[in-house]
């Protein structure tokens, strides 16, 4: 045998690999023990206690047993490519520990553990490192990762003897590959997926990411949520939601003056004067507050990130809990909600629908999701003459406002229009070089807020000149990840305004009192104020 046999196992009075079944079982059990111990570190101790399920030891035993098949499948995968039990154990433990470490890092950064839909964002994390604050994923990261994965694997392959039977080797290799890969493949087969998803749903119950991370550990929780996501009957969910909303197209919206609705989703916008920052000047925001028929603080779908969750809540009018496991990344299954979201309803009622977002069209799969949700036209980053080295990291709100006004001018006077604008200007990171000589992240954020306020004035003044009713909805998608100011924000609710402009303005208007609102109610509230919301939708 190799050097490992002669020296590495010299203290053992027998050769472990002469007992392949016992060694393999022992390595699997060792993996389970290490994984059970390390899974707890996916969340800080305080969060773990806070989200621990309130039930007894019997249920806890069931949760532990439920993790064993997941660990076994990962172990089988490493074993299938090597037929080396020690390597399979090391690979399995490393695999789970890496997932736990990623989950802990994500929670530290954005206060949410790893969720199954994050796997769909892996390519985006490496493609858009700045927007994910992942600039450290550079060449050094790849060298270290490569050396660890392939270097350690090579050492095991060289020093650890294989236990692959001498006879019928190809047969046993294929059998093991089938055992390792077969169950994963069967998850996509309806007759297997549906009962499996139902069983997992009974086990998991509520889709509570933090609680399920405590119960099952990071990777098992990700797998269980993915199985539920694959098997959930969205047609039934959508049918129930449609019945609740009574969203009949013929009862929808009509108006003789061809109104225009502009929804401006302002990236990371929150009025810092709520937190005692009196140095900032936001005259346009103050103006909107006085002119609004409704304004106040907007609850968070997610604090500090995941813009698409707030975005979908506003566009759909759906409470995140109502869309079950899709809530974490609704655009993955956008087609299922096409008939009940606002853009689709408006388009079918004869409105022109336009989505404007000065960022890569493939990000969050918007290039696929938005047409499915009812937007007939998309204006994305490739439509802007933007050079980061010349214009800054993101397209400014001033440039975006000018583009919105230009697109609005193209809308025929006799046609109603719905424009959803998602800005990018104040997305982090707030690093030196973004605003003059400023170096402090808070100062940079405040300066961009003031720039955004000036751009809003440009937009509002332009919209007020139109000869049609205009309804303007403005809101911040989430609080900024401004850790040097607060982590987390003491009150993460953002600001919103529903403002009538141009011919929609009343002759006499008195300022309104602030009203708290939820993102999924925002467009419904606007339509009621505009008298564009029929009884059938209430």
From Swiss-Prot:
It holds the Pfam family Sulfatase. It comes from the Bacteria. GO terms for cellular component: plasma membrane. Its main location: membrane. Keywords: Capsule biogenesis/degradation, Cell membrane, Membrane, Transmembrane, Transmembrane helix. It is found in: Cell membrane. Pathway: Capsule biogenesis; capsule polysaccharide biosynthesis. One of its GO terms (biological process) is capsule polysaccharide biosynthetic process. PANTHER family: LIPOTEICHOIC ACID SYNTHASE, PHOSPHOGLYCEROL TRANSFERASE I. This is Capsular polysaccharide biosynthesis protein RkpI. It comes from Rhizobium meliloti (strain 1021). The gene is rkpI.
């Amino acid at each position: 045998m190799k050097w490992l046999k002669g020296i590495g196992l010299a203290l053992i009075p027998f050769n472990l690999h002469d007992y392949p079944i016992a060694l393999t079982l022992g390595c699997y059990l060792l993996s389970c023990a290490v994984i059970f111990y390390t899974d707890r570190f996916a969340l800080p101790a305080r969060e773990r206690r806070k989200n621990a399920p309130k039930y007894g030891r019997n249920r806890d035993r069931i949760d532990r047993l439920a993790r064993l098949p997941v660990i076994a499948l990962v172990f089988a995968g490493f074993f299938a490519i090597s037929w080396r039990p020690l390597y399979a154990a090391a690979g399995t433990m490393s695999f789970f520990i890496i997932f736990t470490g990623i989950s802990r890092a994500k929670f530290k950064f954005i206060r949410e553990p790893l969720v199954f839909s994050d796997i769909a964002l892996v390519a985006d994390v490496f493609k858009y490192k700045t927007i994910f604050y992942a600039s450290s994923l550079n060449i050094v990261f790849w060298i270290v990762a490569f050396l660890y994965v392939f270097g350690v694997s090579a050492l095991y392959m060289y020093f650890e003897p294989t236990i692959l039977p001498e006879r019928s080797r190809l047969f046993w290799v294929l059998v093991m590959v089938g055992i390792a890969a077969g169950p994963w493949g069967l998850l996509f087969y309806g007759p297997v997926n549906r009962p499996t998803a139902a069983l997992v749903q009974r086990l998991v119950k509520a889709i509570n990411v933090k609680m399920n991370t405590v119960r099952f550990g990071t990777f098992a929780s990700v797998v269980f949520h993915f199985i539920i996501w694959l098997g959930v009957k969205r047609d039934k969910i959508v049918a129930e939601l449609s019945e609740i909303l009574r969203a009949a197209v013929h009862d929808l919206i009509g108006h003789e003056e061809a109104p225009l609705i502009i929804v401006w989703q302002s990236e990371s916008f929150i009025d810092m004067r709520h937190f005692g920052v009196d140095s900032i000047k936001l005259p346009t925001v103050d103006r909107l507050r006085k002119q609004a028929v409704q304004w106040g603080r907007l609850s968070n779908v997610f604090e500090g990130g995941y813009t698409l969750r707030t975005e979908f809540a506003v566009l759909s009018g759906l409470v995140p809990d109502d869309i079950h496991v899709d809530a974490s990344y609704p655009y993955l299954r956008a087609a299922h909600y096409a008939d009940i979201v606002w853009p689709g309803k408006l388009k079918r009622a004869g409105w022109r629908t336009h989505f404007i977002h000065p960022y890569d069209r493939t990000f969050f799969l918007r290039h696929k999701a938005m047409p499915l949700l009812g937007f007939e036209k998309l204006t994305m980053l490739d439509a802007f003459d933007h050079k980061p080295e010349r214009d800054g990291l993101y397209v400014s709100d001033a440039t975006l406002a000018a583009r919105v006004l230009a697109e609005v001018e193209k809308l025929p006077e006799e046609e109603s229009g719905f424009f959803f604008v998602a800005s990018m200007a104040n997305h982090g990171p707030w690093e030196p070089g973004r605003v003059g000589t400023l170096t402090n992240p808070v100062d940079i954020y405040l300066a961009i807020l003031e720039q955004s306020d000036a751009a809003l004035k440009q937009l509002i003044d332009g919209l007020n000149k139109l000869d049609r009713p205009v309804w303007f909805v403005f809101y911040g998608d989430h609080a900024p990840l401004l850790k040097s100011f607060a982590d987390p924000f003491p009150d993460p609710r953002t600001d919103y305004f529903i403002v009538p402009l141009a011919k929609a303005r009343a002759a006499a208007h008195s300022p309104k009192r602030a009203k708290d609102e939820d993102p999924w109610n925002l467009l419904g509230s606007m339509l009621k104020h505009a008298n564009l919301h029929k009884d059938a939708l209430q």
